Amino acid sequence: MADSCIFCKIAQKQIPSTIVYEDDEIFAFKDINPIAPIHILVIPKQHIASLNEITEENEAFIGKVLYKVSLIGKKECPEGYRVVNNIGEDAGQTVKHIHFHILGGKKLAWDKL
């Protein structure tokens, strides 16, 4: 755990959240500032700053995280959902702990970036 990482603290239940899913390695919770009717964050409990820090040693683990993203997405958003992962400040990553946004609950537009 990174001492100052808010997502590590949420996964360790030092900061309260609305839990959607949890196992020994993965934690999913509702975003406190949702941008869609359903907005869930899925994180590994292990601190990994971003996809750019994935190594051969943890590539299979990230596959497991993405599998859980798909299971949670199908359950929570049966009509469809979007998965977003921001990498780096220019992309909008504000928390340096890898996380996947599941967005759904309405028809989502695809606008210009």
Swiss-Prot record:
An annotated Gene Ontology molecular function: hydrolase activity
Subcellular location: Nucleus; Cytoplasm
Binding site for AMP: 31, 86, 92, 94, 99, 101
Active site: 99 (tele-amp-histidine intermediate)
Annotated signal peptide: none
Catalytic reaction list: adenosine 5'-phosphoramidate + H2O = AMP + NH4(+)
Motif extent (Histidine triad motif): 97-101
Record-linked Pfam families: HIT
Family stated for the protein in its record: Belongs to the HINT family.
Record-linked PANTHER family: HISTIDINE TRIAD HIT PROTEIN
Protein name: Histidine triad nucleotide-binding protein
Species this chain originates from: Entamoeba histolytica (strain ATCC 30459 / HM-1:IMSS / ABRM)
